[in-house]
Amino acid sequence: MARSMTSLVAVVPAAGVGSRMKADRPKQYLQIHGKTILEHTIERLLSHPAITQVVVAVSEDDPYYSELAIAQHPDIVRVAGGKERADSVLSALRFLSLQQQKADWVLVHDAARPCVAHQDIDALIERCSSHETGGILATPVRDTMKRANAQQMIDHTVDRNALWHALTPQMFKAEVLTDALSDALAQGVAITDEASALEWRGELPALVQGCSSNIKVTQPEDLALAEFYLSREKDRK
């Protein structure tokens, strides 16, 4: 691990409702092995030796977070989340900018990715330590990709050779990411992840290949897969 990045802050946007899960609560509060997905995710981040603090952005009217044991953890800070992901990340970044000891770099990680491997975080930190902009974890596209027309029929096959699935964490300089998100939102630009804000400014974030097990729990069937990956890791310990 690069010596210049021995202390990092992770930002977790967790204000989404996860409607595609069709559950009685936001997906980050569904349980696996007696813990919520959010707890698994945050504990995975905080157990990494380079991450010293996690700032989690939660909806102000969220009734679940305060009931979690992690809500009282001294290295986990709750801030108000926003309507969109970018608003939540920006809220966390603005909180960090007001602290006496400001974070130079931040790792932004999805609340519903509880299976991220420490070795992938190591690789991301190592790559970003020598990259001007920062970078993201990603996996190369393996399947044949089709572009559809308006009638949901195949228009043409897309060349997959240069296509990657964007994952998280995504790691950038805190000040640069703050400016990029602020400017993009002010211009009405659609921001689906942090890298897209940097791309809009003409930056070229690095792609760091990560494990395909770093899934995002989005659909009901993803819950069983995340449980499998977490169980497999537990058995290895």
From Swiss-Prot:
The record marks R20, K27 as: Transition state stabilizer. GO terms for molecular function: 2-C-methyl-D-erythritol 4-phosphate cytidylyltransferase activity. Its EC number is 2.7.7.60. Pfam families: IspD. PROSITE patterns: ISPD (PS01295). GO terms for biological process: isopentenyl diphosphate biosynthetic process, methylerythritol 4-phosphate pathway. InterPro entries: IspD, IspD/TarI, IspD/TarI_cytidylyltransf_bact, ISPD_synthase_CS, Nucleotide-diphossugar_trans. It catalyses: 2-C-methyl-D-erythritol 4-phosphate + CTP + H(+) = 4-CDP-2-C-methyl-D-erythritol + diphosphate. Pathway: Isoprenoid biosynthesis; isopentenyl diphosphate biosynthesis via DXP pathway; isopentenyl diphosphate from 1-deoxy-D-xylulose 5-phosphate: step 2/6. The record marks R160, K216 as: Positions MEP for the nucleophilic attack. Keywords: Isoprene biosynthesis, Nucleotidyltransferase, Transferase. Belongs to the IspD/TarI cytidylyltransferase family. IspD subfamily. Catalyzes the formation of 4-diphosphocytidyl-2-C-methyl-D-erythritol from CTP and 2-C-methyl-D-erythritol 4-phosphate (MEP). PANTHER family: 2-C-METHYL-D-ERYTHRITOL 4-PHOSPHATE CYTIDYLYLTRANSFERASE, CHLOROPLASTIC. This is 2-C-methyl-D-erythritol 4-phosphate cytidylyltransferase. It comes from Vibrio vulnificus (strain CMCP6). The lineage of its organism: Bacteria, Pseudomonadati, Pseudomonadota, Gammaproteobacteria, Vibrionales.
